[in-house]
Amino acid sequence: MPTLLFRSPSDPATAWTTALRRHDAGLDVRVWPATGAVEDIEYALIWASPDGFLHDLPALRVVFSLGAGVDHLMGSEVPEGVELVRMVDPALTEGMIEYVAYQVLRRHRHMADYERQQTGAEWRIHSQTRPGERRVGLLGLGELGSACARTLSGLGFDVAGWARSSHEIPGVTAVSGSDGLDWLLGRSDIVICLLPLTEATRGILNGQLFQRMSPGSTLINAARGQHLVEDDLLIALGEGRLGHAVLDAFQEEPLPPGHAFWRHPHITVTPHIASLTNPDTGAEAVARGIHADQAGEPIPHRVDRGRGY
């Protein structure tokens, strides 16, 4: 009987253990700190390893991340020789599609302007632009980025995407390299960051990048707070280089009450809720991974530690 250890400071243990047992009745699920005999534990489903406890599990084979990102597990937290698997959950993808499409449509149709006008009883109609005339650029064309790109293209937007390697996505202009990035930034009315957090992408949303963006454009960061140089964003907004920013992730979370972002008229703050892992569909993905490993087959969505995703 395979044994899995669940540990998370915020995800509901009962919901996850119930779902895991439903998708694999033969799985022995344990919840930290009730580990039982640690030499039995082959699998771990966690958000982080703050105290290095994974190194105390001698039979550990695979660590499943509770989130789509694995940047928090890329140091020495996961022992050498142990597979690291990122979460690819249909509900997680659906949630990101909803968030990104909503924020793009909100900017596209001037909804924030109309809400402000209502507070002052101001009847003013803004011009409407057809979706095909609104250029949207995505940074990152992984599982989430590609899904969002396809959805936005299906809504009629002029969509381009940039990634480290070349991609082919119907209805989307996919580019790579520094020239491709320059082209995407300069032509996009809305730029969406869905990049994985690696040493190469840490701080990528900075003053130099903002200078290359179309004047007055909108930035949506639904990836990691560490992608963004916060002071550079405030400068870019103050100078009018950017028109608005929608931020779902931050350097420090929860965002401190006194932080400038909360009350900035050109920043929309959401509390890292763009997409949340669903226990039922997430547990199904984990069960599939365990079944594959037990059968001696490759586990889907394994992380390349050299690339960081």
Locate predicted features:
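Phosphate-coordination loops involved in phosphoryl transfer and adenosine-cofactor binding
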Residues: 1, 81, 132-135, 216
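N-terminal glycine-/charge-rich "phosphate-binding" loop or analogous flexible N-terminal tail
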Residues: 1-43
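Short acidic low-complexity segments
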Residues: 29-40, 51-54, 171-187
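Phosphate/diphosphate ligand-binding glycine-rich loop within oxidoreductases
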Residues: 42-115
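C-terminal helix-to-coil terminal segments
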Residues: 83-87, 91-96, 113-114, 253-309
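Glycine-rich NAD(P)-binding loop of Rossmann-like domains
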Residues: 114-147, 174
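Gly/Ala-rich phosphate-binding loop of Rossmann-like dinucleotide-binding domains
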Residues: 149, 153, 237-238
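Rossmann-like adenosine-cofactor binding region
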Residues: 165-260
